[in-house]
């Protein structure tokens, strides 16, 4: 009898272990995520972001270095901007506090490496994942003396960097502009590129793309808007005796092998905000041409 009881206990134990192992294996299989859809070029997910064709929810990971969390006001205005221009029924925010990488400056390659290490939100089911990193280090190649500083950049279809330390420094340069103003404008501008603007995954209804010098000194389309006062407008920066844009060299240093959809300069944001402040307006909006483009690609307005 005792032997029979022992046999039953052994059978139950083996069955339990087997079930637990199978359950664990199933869980691991279910939680595995295909990250490839979040590693595409800037603008490749424009329609997916704007419309509800494939995804009805945006999950945005706000990854920030301790002490460099974006202001609540900026994030509220940013999510309002997304609701205004996309058909997403739900926008979820996931805050991830990170330790400092202890770097004096960051290149896009270093930023991408940090994303690989720290990102937790990806596309899954009907949810589209976005990653935004708020750093405590400026961009490689910044030149404070010449006023050439980078506030943010998009470098993949769902990836963005905001140089929060530089955002805060820029906000101190004007008594009429605060930290939230600079954060909001930077976030909205860079996300405009994830919308596919300008001609960066979302086709132009009418030609309104501005031009700037490339490395060879030729004027080429620069994926920004040529309409005055538009959020997606980029101001050219000249600071050398030859008149060649200093931004060309600093951008090449910053990109370091990774192509950026946009490297947003402090001068551009400061000019946009000061123009709007002079008109008594607090926010910088998309112009009519950009609105036409995103509507044609599945956006709201």
Language model region names:
Residues 15-18:
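C-terminal motif of bacterial Sec signal peptides marking the signal peptidase cleavage site
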Residues 22-140, 278-283, 287-301:
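Propeptide-to-catalytic entry region of secreted or membrane-anchored zinc metalloproteases
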Residues 59-61, 131, 159-161, 230-231:
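Generic structural signal for residues positioned in beta-strands
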Residues 174-275:
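The catalytic-center signature of Zn2+-dependent metalloproteases
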Residues 79-188, 194-217:
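Metzincin-family zinc-dependent endopeptidase catalytic domain
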Residues 1-8:
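Bacterial N-terminal signal peptides that target proteins for export
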């Amino acid at each position: 009898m005792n032997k029979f009881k022992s046999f039953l206990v052994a059978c139950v134990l083996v069955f339990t272990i087997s079930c637990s192992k199978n359950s664990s294996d199933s869980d691991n299989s279910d939680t595995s995520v295909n990250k490839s859809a979040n590693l595409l070029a800037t603008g490749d997910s424009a329609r997916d972001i704007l419309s509800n064709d494939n995804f009805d929810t945006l999950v945005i990971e706000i990854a920030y270095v301790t002490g460099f969390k974006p202001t609540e006001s900026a994030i509220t205005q940013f999510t309002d901007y997304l609701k205004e221009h996309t058909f997403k029924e739900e926008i979820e925010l996931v805050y991830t506090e990170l330790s400092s990488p202890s770097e004096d400056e960051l290149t896009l390659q270093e930023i991408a490496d940090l994303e690989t290490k720290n990102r937790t939100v990806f596309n899954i089911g009907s949810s589209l994942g976005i990653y935004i990193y708020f750093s405590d280090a400026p961009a490689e190649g910044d030149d404070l003396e010449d006023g050439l500083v980078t506030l943010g950049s998009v470098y993949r279809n769902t990836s963005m960097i905001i140089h929060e330390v530089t955002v805060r420094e820029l906000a101190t340069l004007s008594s009429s502009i605060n930290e939230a103003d600079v954060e909001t404008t930077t976030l909205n501008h860079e996300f405009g590129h994830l919308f596919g603007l300008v001609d960066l995954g979302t086709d132009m209804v009418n030609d309104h793309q501005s031009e700037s010098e490339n490395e060879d000194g030729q004027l080429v389309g620069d994926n920004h808007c040529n309409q005055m006062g538009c959020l997606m407008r980029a101001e050219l920066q000249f600071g050398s005796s030859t008149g060649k844009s200093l931004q060309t060299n600093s951008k090449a240093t910053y990109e370091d092998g990774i192509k950026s959809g946009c490297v947003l300069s402090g001068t551009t944001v400061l000019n946009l905000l000061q123009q709007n402040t002079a008109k008594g307006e607090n926010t910088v909006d998309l112009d009519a041409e950009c609105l036409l483009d995103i509507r044609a690609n599945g956006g709201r307005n």
